[in-house]
Amino acid sequence: NWRLPCAGLSFVDYFAQRPSALQNTVHRARKKLDRAGIGKVDIHTQQGKFLDAAISAFESIYQRSWKPAEAFPDFVRRLCVLAAQKGKLRLGVLSLNGIAIASQIWLVDQGKAYIFKLAYDPDAARFSPGSLLTAALMEHVLDFDAVDEVDYLSGDDAYKQDWMSHRHERHGLIAFDLATPRGLLAAARHYGGKKRRAWRAGEAT
C-alpha cells in the first residue's frame, strides 16, 4: 500500500513536492470547474442535519461510478455515523451547481488519516473531481488535523503514487492442516473456488 509520513508538513509544501503533472491537473481542473459554474467542497466531520444527506450523496455517486456494488451497503452508512460520533470522520463531497459529483470517506485516528472510500460521477470526469477532492481533503488533514501520516490503505494503483511518498508491500499467507478433516475441507473450498473463478473467467473471454 502507499502512505505519506507528513509530521509537521503543510499542504503548501506537500503539494509543491507532488509531480508536476498532478499539480497541473489540479490547477486546470479548478479553472474548468470555475468556468462551469459554482464548485463547492464540503467536509463533514461531525453529526448533524447535513450528515445524512452527505452519506446519501456518497452512496448515489458510488452507484454511478465504475466501482463494483457494495456487498454490505449499510455498513458504510453505519461506519460514517459511528466515526462522526467519535469525531473521526472526514467525509468530503464536491458539488457543481448544487449537484454532488465526487465523494470520499477518510478516517482520522491517533494522528493518522486513512483514505477509505472514494468515487466520482463518470459524467463529470472532465473536471478531474477525484483529484480536486483529494487535494481538498489532504489540505484539511495536513493543515487542520495536523496528522503525522496519511495511508491509502490496500492497493497498488498507479495514481496513488502521485499523492503518496512511500510504498509498503504486504504479503498474505494461508495454510491448511491437511491432517485434519477441517483443514482438508477448507483447502478444498479455497482451491476449488479459485479453479471455479478461473474457469468462469475463461468462459467470459
Language-model features and meaning:
Residues 1, 27-30, 66-70, 118, ...:
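Glycine-rich loops and low-complexity Gly/Arg-rich segments
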Residues 1-11, 17, 145-205:
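Active-site/acyl-donor-binding loops of N-acyltransferases
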Residues 1-126:
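A conserved beta-strand-loop-helix scaffold within acyl/acetyltransferase catalytic domains
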Residues 23, 43, 50, 79-82, ...:
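Short, surface-exposed, charged/polar-biased interaction segments
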Residues 37-40, 75-83, 127-132, 141-144, ...:
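Low-complexity, flexible helical/coil segments
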Residues 110-168, 175:
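Acyl-donor binding region in acyl/amide transferases
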